[in-house]
């Protein structure tokens, strides 16, 4: 009976931030797997994955999100779409909903800020089955 329980346990997805820029001291890429893997964030429950960014370009960066095993990457509908930085811990943060036309490999979100404005940023992705996927960013000033 214990074996059945272990078999039913869900394996965490491999979720990646794709960028050509240097994040956390590591040059990224737009391939899967990338050098920037998001980790499950149990404080949100469901299938939310997060990446804390403590070292980033001076005034902004661009990115897409990929889930290993999926043929298309999550991206905004238009290139350079701005992504709002929510204050850390914001209830109901402003997020970008991933609709059916938000998959591909040509567009990227743009995250902008002033130099030294944030101590760190956290990129969050909710890929919970049966809900609209979404991406949001929180910042600690």
Task: Name the predicted role of every residue range.
Residues 7, 34-35, 115:
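Intrinsically disordered, low-complexity regions enriched for glutamine and histidine
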Residues 53-62, 66-141:
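The feature marks proteins involved in alpha-glucan
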Residues 2, 28-30, 134-136:
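Generic detector of ordered, mature protein regions
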Residues 1-14:
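Bacterial Sec-dependent N-terminal signal peptides
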Residues 13-58, 68-88:
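Aromatic-rich carbohydrate-binding modules that target alpha-glucans
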């Amino acid at each position: 009976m214990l074996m059945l329980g272990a078999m039913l346990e869900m394996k965490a997805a491999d979720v990646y931030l794709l960028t050509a820029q240097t994040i956390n001291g590591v040059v990224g890429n737009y391939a899967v797997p990338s050098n920037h893997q998001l980790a499950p964030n149990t404080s949100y429950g469901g299938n939310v994955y997060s990446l804390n960014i403590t070292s980033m370009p001076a005034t902004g960066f661009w990115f897409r999100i990929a889930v290993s095993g999926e043929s298309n990457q999550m991206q905004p509908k238009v290139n350079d779409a701005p992504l709002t930085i929510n204050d850390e811990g914001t209830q109901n943060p402003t997020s970008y909903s991933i609709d059916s036309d938000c998959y591909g490999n040509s567009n990227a979100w743009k995250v902008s800020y002033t130099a030294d404005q944030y101590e760190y940023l956290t990129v969050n992705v909710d890929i919970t089955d049966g809900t609209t996927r979404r991406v949001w960013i929180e910042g600690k000033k």
